[in-house]
């Protein structure tokens, strides 16, 4: 006999993250008091994480269509066509709150969840990326969180067998109490064999696949829709536990039943577990769903209907099966050692009915749970405009060479080798460009094509000016893909913000989305998938607005690509784009001058497109021997990275007389690239760039073992490498 369900009280309602008006909406909708299980189901489906109730109205303005887009937002992942009946399936998603509470398991299950989103669509994962945001290095928890998250990302990806090929790692005090772990997965599928979540047909069996259900992850989606407070450590039991080896078996079994044409619809059990997957499949197919929880495989005794519906145990799928394929599908899953159980059927009623122990535990209208959750147009105010920082008003606290060495050893600009060397970035044998460059390049098997992959955002820009920051995040992804020779095709986004009930935070989200939308349109990069993570606050202190952008581009011929390393001595170094010395919100202004202030650099999207097309053309023509986009740290940091990577120095001209030297070298003007060309090609290249109206300046020549600016002290490339490589391993070893 099951235990009596708790009485529905205002305290119980509030603990489920439901506001009084939302509970009243439930009463109006079903005409009675909900059962405890029904309250849990509404809590899961109507929270921010699953319903997007604060952001959905603004997400509708994003560009999502293009001739090459096969599937846009609304499914498990986005899909783009790359020709030859090949499709790229990709998405990025957050696992922020769990990773702060339990960094290893939070990160592992973040990777596992995004991999399932991709292979649920019928794709074999070929790469993972991530964007990690940690607190101030001096904060007592930061080192522990970095260690746990990086180990978790590597532990899952390495064991599952997918390379982790790129990402971002940043540090800022605003992430002290709320780190960000954004995971991106990319897979390949046949264009004509994409599997979706919408159920079809009445009386079709609904099958539970994968690992057994336990109590781990209880209320995870609701936790991800609330602010943290001082008691957040007590939420450790709500963090899911991942098993990458079980996920590998699930991948192979799912791809096998898909190849055998067994599947009508399929959905992974992620946030809100069985509840969300069943509701979404039924609602998208305009059908009802009847579930019998007595058939659900469990690994703990005495689980209630409430617990089974809200468990977020990992490595599980829900599938609507072709009835005639039941025996064949079951044999496949048994072969792989995984559970296979028919737990329900589709119905024509448009009701979501859950039974357990012979009793009905939930009977709810399915569309209102899924497609028609509450929708808010929350008050929002624009961020105040910050003044432009004029370079001549900023005193240089140290000579340029010393400033460069200091910047290369800062937490944000130092080499992240310590991070990515813990990831297997070459498993599968298709990684052509490893982490540490502008974008990763992964070979598409059985042909000449490659994929360029990147993750980008500059949160301090988004804080200072959300609109320009949103534009810049997309533009930098565009530049990074271009810099390796890829044609940018589409993006996935992961929008991380604070409490949307605060108008200034909602204003950041609205402003960033406006900038992202404009940039996507101008740069022909539609958004095909994404995730929104709100309430990233602890005790009222929010994170920096962090709309991570995951970009995917195509190389028709991966041999026509570029890297950032200087290749040979005696080559001309060209600066493409205009340099005005914009110091506002620059890393130099913050970390050398001690001033985190000013308006961020504006982004001219027409110039971004024009400059990108020209650079890509140079790479494909073979005239560009090395390419690097300019971003954090500006011109001299980018030059140092090229020198370090190629182990070749450079002689650099002094800045133009009309500029301020430190602003010329460290300003963060947008739309710029560094390109090296052979002396024999120089005049032809300069003439070509002039004819198409793209600004270009020769600023030096490669050669030697030092980076030498005319009139300044030379710095040995070995010294630059030491500065660049040592901060992070020393920090993790407790030496700084």
From Swiss-Prot:
It is an enzyme of class 6 (ligase). GO terms for cellular component: cytoplasm. The keyword ATP-binding applies. It is found in: Cytoplasm. SUPFAM superfamilies: PurM C-terminal domain-like (SSF56042), PurM N-terminal domain-like (SSF55326). Keywords: ATP-binding, Cytoplasm, Ligase, Magnesium, Metal-binding, Nucleotide-binding, Purine biosynthesis. ATP binds at residues 52, 91, 493, 530. Pfam families: AIRS, AIRS_C, FGAR-AT_linker. It catalyses: N(2)-formyl-N(1)-(5-phospho-beta-D-ribosyl)glycinamide + L-glutamine + ATP + H2O = 2-formamido-N(1)-(5-O-phospho-beta-D-ribosyl)acetamidine + L-glutamate + ADP + phosphate + H(+). Its main location: cytoplasm. The keyword rRNA processing does not apply. Gene3D superfamilies: PurM-like C-terminal domain, PurM-like, N-terminal domain. One of its GO terms (molecular function) is phosphoribosylformylglycinamidine synthase activity. The active site is at residues 49, 95. Signal peptide: none annotated. Monomer. Part of the FGAM synthase complex composed of 1 PurL, 1 PurQ and 2 PurS subunits. PANTHER family: PHOSPHORIBOSYLFORMYLGLYCINAMIDINE SYNTHASE SUBUNIT PURL. Part of the phosphoribosylformylglycinamidine synthase complex involved in the purines biosynthetic pathway. Catalyzes the ATP-dependent conversion of formylglycinamide ribonucleotide (FGAR) and glutamine to yield formylglycinamidine ribonucleotide (FGAM) and glutamate. The FGAM synthase complex is composed of three subunits. PurQ produces an ammonia molecule by converting glutamine to glutamate. PurL transfers the ammonia molecule to FGAR to form FGAM in an ATP-dependent manner. This is Phosphoribosylformylglycinamidine synthase subunit PurL. It comes from Rhodopseudomonas palustris (strain HaA2).
